Amino acid sequence: MKVQVQYSILLIVDEKISSSNQVIGLAEAIKIHKKEIKIKILYSHKLVPTLLPNWMIYYLLKVNLINVKSKFEYEKINLIISCGRVSSPLSLFIKEKTQCKNIHILDPYFKRKEFDKIIIPKHDKYKKSDNYIEIIGAIVNNNNKKISLEKIKFFKNKLSI
């Protein structure tokens, strides 16, 4: 009898509903291809000061002036999916602690090369990089908050999950 290993995804979002919809949509697409998934949501705007620039948030996390361990234990995480400016330093910090992969939706505004994948809308016209995935439109349809089958296939191929 084959025992399936649980795949653990941490979603990091800011206070915007659109950010939550995008990370949940991508997690749902991954869930279709993996049977046993554990999903946890972390709200970055409740953990870090949102008015600070990303580099400063990241630095404060590194030197333990912002302590997220009390709010979140570094359990076994296979993947982090984050969206929103303030979520990106938290995503990188936790990635370093757990040695997992991470995907950021939209521009993280700093340390772009340290993200495994960054999902960017094609209309934003960023300079191409190996870790960028360009998409047309949003990950999820705002009307029904579901990801299309075409996008599920697209992400499965691009993310190698």
Positions of the model-derived regions?
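N-terminal pre-catalytic "stem/leader" segment of glycosyltransferase-like enzymes
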Residues: M1-L65
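Structural motif
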Residues: S8, N78-L79, K117
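Short beta-strand/turn micro-motifs composed of small residues
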Residues: I12-V13, L106, I120-K122
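Glycosyltransferases and closely related glycan-assembly transferases
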Residues: V23, K31, E75-L79, P89-I103
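Short, well-structured alpha-helical segments in soluble
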Residues: L61-K76
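Membrane-proximal helix-turn-helix segments that form the acceptor-binding/catalytic region
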Residues: S70, H104-D116
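Short His-centered aromatic/hydrophobic patch
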Residues: C83-R85
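A nucleotide-sugar donor-handling region in carbohydrate enzymes
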Residues: K113-I161
